[in-house]
């Protein structure tokens, strides 16, 4: 248990930041899953509309991963690995017909 005022405040700040970071990570996971789902949808029914869905969801996922790295929620290598994994999946999906 914290004994002085500054230590108590640091506990509150750490908890607040933990919740914010958790939210970022959750959103990154959600957008990644959405991108992969859109890729599967494109595989089943390749058309321009589904291709646009894949590219827009990919851009959103990349943007959020970059923001998470910028705010030190994710390590830069972790962010790069996530982007690489998503991009490889999308690339194989869009090139395979």
Swiss-Prot record:
Protein family membership: Belongs to the bacterial ribosomal protein bS20 family.
Tagged with keyword rRNA-binding: yes
HAMAP family per the UniProt record, alphabetical: Ribosomal_bS20
One GO MF term attached to the UniProt entry: structural constituent of ribosome
GO BP field: translation
UniProt protein name: Small ribosomal subunit protein bS20
Keyword Cytoplasm: no
GO annotations of cellular component type: small ribosomal subunit
Designated gene of the protein: rpsT
Keywords on record: Ribonucleoprotein, Ribosomal protein, RNA-binding, rRNA-binding
Role, per record: Binds directly to 16S ribosomal RNA.
């Amino acid at each position: 248990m914290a004994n002085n005022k500054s230590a108590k405040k640091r506990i509150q700040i750490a908890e607040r930041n933990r919740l914010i970071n958790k939210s970022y990570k959750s959103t990154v996971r959600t957008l990644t899953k959405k991108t992969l789902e859109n890729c599967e949808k494109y595989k089943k029914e390749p058309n321009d509309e589904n291709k646009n869905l894949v590219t827009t969801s990919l851009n959103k996922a990349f943007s959020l991963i970059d923001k998470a790295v910028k705010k030190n929620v994710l390590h830069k290598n972790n962010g790069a690995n996530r982007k690489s994994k998503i991009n490889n999946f999308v690339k194989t999906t869009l090139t395979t017909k």
